[in-house]
Swiss-Prot record:
Protein known as: UDP-N-acetylenolpyruvoylglucosamine reductase
Organism: Bacillus subtilis (strain 168)
Cofactor(s) annotated in UniProt: FAD
The gene coding this protein: murB
Catalytic residue list: 174, 225 (proton donor), 295
Pathway info: Cell wall biogenesis; peptidoglycan biosynthesis
MF GO annotations: FAD binding; flavin adenine dinucleotide binding; UDP-N-acetylmuramate dehydrogenase activity
EC number from the UniProt entry: 1.3.1.98
Job description of the protein: Cell wall formation.
Alphabetized InterPro entries for the sequence: FAD-bd_PCMH, FAD-bd_PCMH-like_sf, FAD-bd_PCMH_sub1, FAD-bd_PCMH_sub2, MurB, MurB_C, MurB_C_sf, Oxid_FAD_bind_N
Main location: cytoplasm
Cellular compartments per GO CC: cytosol
Keywords recorded for this protein, A-Z: Cell cycle, Cell division, Cell shape, Cell wall biogenesis/degradation, Cytoplasm, FAD, Flavoprotein, NADP, Oxidoreductase, Peptidoglycan synthesis
Reactions it catalyzes: UDP-N-acetyl-alpha-D-muramate + NADP(+) = UDP-N-acetyl-3-O-(1-carboxyvinyl)-alpha-D-glucosamine + NADPH + H(+)
Record-level GO BP terms: cell division; cell wall organization; peptidoglycan biosynthetic process; regulation of cell shape
Length: 303
C-alpha cells in the first residue's frame, strides 16, 4: 500500500492516513483499522482517488460521518474514502438546493429552516451525512429523502460517476438502488424544497428534536436504529415486549431508553454487537415468528 499512499499524497487529494482506527470515525466508537483512510477535498479529488485505486487494483470502501455503521474488529482492507469536510458544499437557488454528500443532515435541516424552506423537518436530530441519508433513504415522522430528492451524483462500484434521477434511485422503505442493484455512494444531491412559514418550520424542527432527545439514546455512542421495522410492527416495541431492554453482551447493551438502539456501554467490540444482534433475532423469531433485518450497515473483515 506504500505506493498507493505515496501517489495519493502526491496528487494532493486531501488528508491521507495509514492504518487509521475506524473507531475514531464512527458514532458507535467501534471499528478496526483501515489500511488507508482518505478524506477527499472535493468531488474532483474523489475522481483522482478512483484513478489511483484503479491503477493499483486495490479494494475501496466509502463511509460518511459514521452513523448507521458498524465496522468489524478486523477493520477494512484497501482504501477507505471518508466523505467529510471536502464534500460539504451548499448552493441554494430558489427552492432548490445542491448539497455535498459529506454535509451534515442536521446542519442542512437547521440552515434551511432558518430560510423558511420546508421539506427536511423530519431530519431534525438525525445524525449522519446527506450522502448516507440518500443511500439508505433516511426518514422519520412519516417522511423520507425520496420525497425531496431531485437527482443524486453517484460514485458506482466500478468507479464511474453519473447523475441518477429520483426515479432511477428506486427508493423504498430505508433502501435505494445503491444498496444492492447498483452499488454506489452519493457524492452530492439536488433537493427540492418548498417556501413556507419560517416560524412553523422551526417549531416542527424543535418538536422533532425534542422527541428524539427524550426517546433515543444519542448521548451514548450508538449507530442509530439497529433493525428495520418489520411492518406493521415496530422493532423497538418488539424488543421491549420480549424483555430485552437493558440486555448486555460484553460492552454492547440494548438501550433502556429505546429497544431498537444498541449502545457502546464501554469498551464494546463489533463482535459484542453482532452477538447481541443475533440474540435479538433469535429471541424475536422464537417468541413471535418474526424475522428481524438489520438497518445498520455492517462492513469490514470479509464482508
Amino acid at each position: 500500500m506504500e505506493k498507493v499512499i505515496q501517489e495519493l499524497k502526491e496528487r494532493e487529494v486531501g488528508k491521507v492516513l495509514a492504518n487509521e482506527p475506524l473507531a475514531n470515525h464512527t458514532t458507535m466508537k467501534i471499528g478496526g483499522p483501515a489500511d488507508v483512510l482518505v478524506i477527499p477535498s472535493s468531488v474532483d479529488a474523489v475522481k483522482d482517488i478512483m484513478d489511483v485505486i484503479k491503477k493499483y487494483d486495490v479494494k475501496w470502501t466509502v463511509i460518511g460521518r459514521g452513523s448507521n455503521l458498524l465496522v468489524l474488529d478486523e477493520g477494512i482492507r484497501g482504501v477507505v474514502i471518508k466523505l467529510g469536510a471536502g464534500l460539504d458544499h451548499l448552493e441554494l437557488e430558489g427552492e432548490q438546493v445542491t448539497v455535498g454528500g459529506g454535509y451534515s443532515v442536521v446542519r442542512l435541516a437547521t440552515s434551511l429552516s432558518k430560510k423558511g424552506l420546508s421539506g427536511l423537518e423530519f431530519a431534525a436530530g438525525i445524525p449522519g451525512s446527506v450522502g448516507g441519508a440518500v443511500y439508505m433513504n433516511a426518514g422519520a415522522h412519516g417522511s423520507d429523502m425520496s420525497e425531496i430528492l431531485v437527482k443524486a451524483h453517484i460514485l458506482f462500484e466500478d468507479g464511474t460517476i453519473e447523475w441518477l434521477t429520483n426515479e432511477q434511485m428506486d427508493f423504498s422503505y430505508r433502501t435505494s438502488v445503491l444498496q444492492k442493484k447498483r452499488p454506489g455512494v452519493c457524492l452530492e444531491a439536488v433537493l427540492q424544497l418548498e417556501q413556507k412559514d419560517k416560524e412553523s418550520i422551526v417549531q416542527q424542527m424543535q418538536s422533532n428534536k425534542d422527541y428524539r432527545k427524550n426517546t433515543q439514546p444519542y448521548s451514548s455512542p450508538c449507530a442509530g436504529s439497529i433493525f428495520r421495522n418489520p411492518l406493521p410492527n415496530h422493532a423497538g416495541n418488539l424488543v421491549e415486549k420480549a424483555g430485552l431492554k437493558g440486555y448486555q453482551i460484553g460492552g454492547a447493551k440494548i438501550s433502556e431508553m429505546h429497544g431498537n438502539f444498541i449502545v457502546n456501554a464501554g469498551g464494546a467490540s463489533a463482535k459484542d454487537v453482532l452477538d447481541l444482534i443475533d440474540h435479538v433475532k433469535k429471541t424475536i423469531r422464537e417468541k413471535y415468528e418474526i424475522d428481524m433485518h438489520t438497518e445498520v450497515e455492517i462492513i469490514g473483515g470479509n464482508r
